[in-house]
Amino acid sequence: MKKLNNNELPTNIVKQLENIEQQYGKKIEIYADYTDQEFLTLDQANHQAKGEDMIQVIITNEKYNDFVLAHELHHIELELSDEPSISCAVTTGKQDNDGRVLSIANSVFETLEHATIVKEQIADGTFTDAVKAEYLRGIDAALTPKVQLDLANMRFYRTLIMLDGMVFGQHEHDEDWQHNFPTSFKYATKLVEIVEQNDLTVPFQFRRALVNILDAYNEIIISNGYQGMHFHTFLNITPVISKRQLRLSLNQVYQIKHSEFKNRATGKDAFDLIAMNDGQSIATLNLDPAKVTPEFYKAFYQHTIEEVFKGEDIKYLIR
């Protein structure tokens, strides 16, 4: 793995890199770990935090390195900005189940980011017609994976792949997909309509779209006779509220729900803080189950939202 210095990067990438570092006080290091790639995919550059102030980016596609690097830097910039995020502090007790829910949620989350990133990459010149063609070739290959799945699960999988292809590929292959995969196309169309009904640069609308797409995807799963994924109570999604709401008592906006899952940190019963307007958990509370009594609820609910958020260290965004 080779570290890339700024003098080895295109001018536009260096400028993007320096803007992020200056705006957010982070140091970003770029590494090349090139491998043979049959298709261009959006995960051929990835990043991870290295302590509080360092972010490491690793690129694996040499031919399209400028595109995948610019793409990953746009993801980093969105994550560092005022954008809602997904977290999870509970467990089903089965690692595979936990991973499946998080994988789906993260896929939807990244697709929502892609709705903004595709516009940025067209504007900065890194997403050309040639790159789009290669990206869509990869999506087409992903829609016919070399794995055995039953029909319903193949449709669930294709729906998420197609959703991302519609968003980042700007509907260019819709006609082919509708012909070849009509049911998955119908499902994906329902989801992409939610994407396109919201201004995803606005945190409140990004969160609304995220919750609504997960809801719609869950309905697709249930309609095929499978058990739902419990996105509302398994995941926490950053709340976006007004300053006025911070002064309200907790029970005016949120309710505490004794979770069907266990607190991952303690192994004990978990308690979710659920938004009353959309039923989505915003946090897993640090409560001792032995002390959660009717009297506790009565007293806890009288605290202001701001007091609870501060006491429970709950991240929030102002609408």
Residue ranges and their predicted role:
Residues 67, 71, 106, 111-118, ...:
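Non-catalytic, well-ordered alpha-helical scaffold segments
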Residues 53-69:
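Short pre-active-site segment immediately N-terminal to the catalytic Zn-binding motif
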Residues 280-283, 287-316:
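A charge-rich, low-complexity, intrinsically flexible signal that marks solvent-exposed coils, linkers
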Residues 78-115:
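Post-HEXXH active-site segment of zinc metalloproteases
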Residues 139-264, 277-294:
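Pan-zinc metallopeptidase signature
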Residues 1-49, 62, 103-105, 124-126, ...:
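Auxiliary, metal-adjacent structural segments of Zn-dependent hydrolase domains
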Residues 119-143:
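Short helix/loop segments within enzyme catalytic domains
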Residues 64-84:
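Active-site recognition of the HExxH zinc-binding catalytic motif
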